[in-house]
Amino acid sequence: MIKKIFITLVFSLLLVENSYSKESFFDEAKKLFDKEKYEESKFLFQRDIVFNPKKAGSYLYLAKIFKVEENLMEEEKNLKTTLLLDPKNEEAIYLLMDIEIERSNFAKVKELKENFEKVCSKLCPKISSINEKLKNFDTKNES
């Protein structure tokens, strides 16, 4: 009887410790990202995705890292994955609008902007910067 209780207790402790370590991947990766240690944080965000594949935050931070590394294809892939998991993620929508403006894909920018205006809560002032970028692009084309 004591042996069964001991085994159950040890097993429970291992499960608790394991679930804590999974959660700490994201937290630790975010701390490293804030310190601009992108390679180390990228590795931890990728590990977090292995344990939590439906966590949009890890994909968003990976997209930000790939933006710093100027890897447009990976940045876009991670932003789209973020939006698949969390369609109302305003930061991902905003970053994707930036990419589409650079590509001059104004139909996509318009679609994203409409969606952004519906869901924005923290980044609403960024709409004016998107409008300004669009206006600047139109001015360049007229010249």
Region roles according to the model:
Residues 23-47, 51:
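Alpha-helical segment of the N-proximal tetratricopeptide repeat
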Residues 34-35, 68-69, 102, 119, ...:
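Register position in tetratricopeptide repeats
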Residues 48, 81-82, 115-116:
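Canonical positions in the second alpha-helix
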Residues 61, 95, 129-133:
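Canonical tetratricopeptide repeat
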